[in-house]
Amino acid sequence: MAREKFERKKPHINIGTIGHVDHGKTTLTAAITMALAVGTGKSGKRYDEIDAAPEEKARGITINTAHVEYETETRHYAHVDCPGHADYVKNMITGAAQMDGAILVVSGADGPMPQTKEHILLAKQVGVPNMVVFLNKEDQVDDPELLELVELEVRETLNSYDFPGDEIPVVAGSALMALEALTQDSKLARGSNPWVDKIYALMDQVDKYIPTPQRDTDKPFLMAIEDVFSITGRGTVATGRVERGKVVVGENVDIVGLANIPQNTTVTGLEMFQKTLEESVAGDNVGVLLRGIQKDQVERGMVLAKPNTIKPHIRFESEVYVLAKEEGGRHTPFFPGYRPQFYVRTTDVTGKIDSFKADDGSDTQMVMPGDRVKMVVSLIQPIAIEKGMRFAIREGGRTVGAGIVSEILE
């Protein structure tokens, strides 16, 4: 069956929900898809369709990132519902890297919680430039003054992580009440239900406040591989988000990383949201069909790139901020020879920290939680690295630092 073409009529934005577990991220995502499907002939997504990652059912915790799409009058959105649970921050680091903006969901009944702060910090680290706040569960808050206090606390928290907390739009509402109303009557237009209207009000703010990003379309093509599938009779498909540049069916690409020498292949097809494309540009979440490549020759953590534009490296110098104990970082110092995981794009690679330098250029033998430091890192596997690239340092399931590559050494 021929797939229909993906039409590019509106600017495309990648967005996601972040916030503490059980504050209502997935419920809000479902309510947005249902509200924006009204009158379009499309259908929204139910809560259980978004929450459908296989491991979750036992614990009711979102683990995998769910991708949904919807449109406002001015834009097309791809929305990731980020995992809320601390153990799955690993997924958020790969998922949040996909966001041009975020909707921070905070329960108006509880206020900011530890994971709220962790997600704001992560958003800062992975470079999510803008966010809008949804104060959820307004129906459970009897005293309007209480909601105002929660809003103030959220704004202060955002300020403390260098987001413009005073100007970020905050919309209060109840995702559950809106979702229930839309489930009973899927044709509720604007103005017919106060709870549903709050969802529209939220999306109006997202449209207005989160700018359409300047895509890096003119730079050389690069896409970090998130997943690899084998399609019988057609070959191997690598999926991911195009980070920069564009790729056209028929072009050659290098597959770089986790090996010393890049592989070269030809792109034989492109698909987005199950529709075929002739070309794919920065910002697209896309599947790339690769000629003559076996499924076991590519894996998550490699990148597809324009030939000879990026090389695999194992050693680099970086500027790193080591999280303080209060931010969920380590409680004890670490020393040269420390071996944590380095998260780069979609990969986690073990690396050894060879040496540290203080801001004044002097060698230092010990790094305390809360320090900012220059460090030289040697990875155990080569991956596609370039100057200015961000990464996270993780250990035992938690983020202990965030950094940016300042020099490539080998």
From Swiss-Prot:
InterPro entries documented for this protein: EF-Tu_GTP-bd, EF-Tu_GTPase, EFTu-like_2, EFTU_2, G_TR_CS, P-loop_NTPase, Small_GTP-bd, T_Tr_GTP-bd_dom
Catalytic activity: GTP + H2O = GDP + phosphate + H(+)
Top EC class, one word: hydrolase
Location of region: G5: 174-176
Keyword Hydrolase applies: yes
Binding site for GTP: 19-26, 81-85, 136-139
Annotated positions binding Mg(2+): T26
Main location group: plastid
Region spans: G1: 19-26
Residue ranges, annotated region (G4): 136-139
Record-level GO cellular component terms: chloroplast; mitochondrion
GO MF annotation, one: GTPase activity
GO BP annotation list: mitochondrial translational elongation
EC number: 3.6.5.3
Keyword Transit peptide attributed: no
Region (G3): 81-84
Location in or out of the cell: Plastid, Chloroplast
Sequence ranges assigned to domain tr-type G in this UniProt record: 10-214
Keyword vocabulary terms for this entry: Chloroplast, Elongation factor, GTP-binding, Hydrolase, Magnesium, Metal-binding, Nucleotide-binding, Plastid, Protein biosynthesis
Region called G2, residue ranges: 60-64
Family from the record: Belongs to the TRAFAC class translation factor GTPase superfamily. Classic translation factor GTPase family. EF-Tu/EF-1A subfamily.
Protein function: GTP hydrolase that promotes the GTP-dependent binding of aminoacyl-tRNA to the A-site of ribosomes during protein biosynthesis.
Record PANTHER family: ELONGATION FACTOR TU, CHLOROPLASTIC, ELONGATION FACTOR TU-RELATED
NCBIfam families: EF-Tu, PRK00049.1, PRK12735.1, PRK12736.1, small_GTP
UniProt-recorded name of the protein: Elongation factor Tu, chloroplastic
